[in-house]
């Protein structure tokens, strides 16, 4: 596929301008996987295609549900065409189950505690500062988003969480938490952007942590071996296959 100029490159993707349409961009999914703000990095052959397939399935489902996203099409497993937008430097996290960083920051909360409604947190995208948590008031004060936009980020992220939670629940899988990002399109409207793949959530089949299917398996490895990376690849393949059902109903 023809590509325009490279706009940016991260640990798991490259973003290019679209060669024929200035309102679009092209995302190429890479085979990289990382943890600890990039302190741990590896290559898993085929991961880019699996992550791209999962992301395309998720965004297709969200688009069909009427959620405003940047997703246009996925002509190839590693390629995604999106509406070009200016990213908001925030990670928006909804949590149904207390686990991961939440219980490290809140040791008084037992792992497995259920939040109803889902608990909302914002984190500033800043690898050098390890993506610090940021309050809605600080988001507004720093000019990252307006108060109205913060409310929209909260409501839309919860809507996305509930849609994905329902899709996983149909397969007896618990969505523990979900991290998404937003951008502003050419009109200034907020849209769900970036990617939503197996790096974006924690999912526990049957609600059992020991059966987790997500990136946490990679994070938890004391030593990363070739066999371990193959185990992770198989999990990403299973998740991509499971999300195929979301668009083939």
From Swiss-Prot:
Specify the pathway: Purine metabolism; IMP biosynthesis via de novo pathway; 5-amino-1-(5-phospho-D-ribosyl)imidazole-4-carboxamide from 5-amino-1-(5-phospho-D-ribosyl)imidazole-4-carboxylate: step 1/2
Annotated GO MF terms: ATP binding; phosphoribosylaminoimidazolesuccinocarboxamide synthase activity
The protein's annotated catalytic reaction(s) are: 5-amino-1-(5-phospho-D-ribosyl)imidazole-4-carboxylate + L-aspartate + ATP = (2S)-2-[5-amino-1-(5-phospho-beta-D-ribosyl)imidazole-4-carboxamido]succinate + ADP + phosphate + 2 H(+)
Entry keyword set: ATP-binding, Ligase, Nucleotide-binding, Purine biosynthesis
EC numbers for this chain: 6.3.2.6
InterPro entries documented for this protein:
SAICAR_synt/ADE2_N, SAICAR_synthetase, SAICAR_synthetase_CS
Could you tell me the Gene Ontology terms of the biological process aspect for this record?
A: 'de novo' IMP biosynthetic process
**What family is it from?**
Belongs to the SAICAR synthetase family.
| Record protein name field | Phosphoribosylaminoimidazole-succinocarboxamide synthase
The gene is purC
């Amino acid at each position: 596929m023809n590509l325009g100029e490279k706009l940016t490159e991260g640990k798991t993707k490259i973003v290019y301008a679209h060669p024929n349409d200035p309102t679009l961009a092209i995302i190429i999914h890479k085979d990289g996987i990382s943890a600890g703000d990039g302190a741990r990095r590896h290559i898993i052959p085929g991961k880019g295609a699996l992550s791209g397939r999962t992301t395309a399935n998720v965004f297709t489902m969200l688009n069909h549900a009427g959620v405003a996203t940047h997703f246009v099409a996925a002509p190839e497993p590693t390629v995604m065409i999106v509406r070009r937008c200016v990213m908001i430097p925030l990670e928006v996290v909804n949590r149904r189950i207390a686990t991961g960083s939440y219980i490290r920051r809140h040791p008084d909360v037992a792992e497995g505690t259920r939040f109803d409604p889902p608990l909302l947190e914002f984190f500033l995208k800043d690898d050098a500062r390890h993506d610090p948590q940021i309050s809605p008031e600080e988001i507004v004060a720093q000019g990252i988003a307006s108060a109205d936009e913060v409310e929209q980020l909260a409501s839309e992220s919860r809507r996305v969480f509930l849609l994905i939670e329902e899709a996983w629940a149909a397969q007896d899988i618990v969505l523990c938490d979900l991290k998404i990002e937003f951008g502003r399109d050419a009109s200034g409207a907020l849209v769900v952007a970036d990617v939503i793949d197996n790096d974006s959530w924690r999912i526990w089949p049957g609600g059992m942590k020991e059966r987790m299917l997500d990136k946490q398996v990679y994070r938890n490895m004391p030593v990363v071996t070739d066999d371990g990376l193959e185990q992770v690849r198989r999990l990403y393949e299973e998740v991509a296959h499971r999300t195929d059902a979301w668009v083939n109903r």
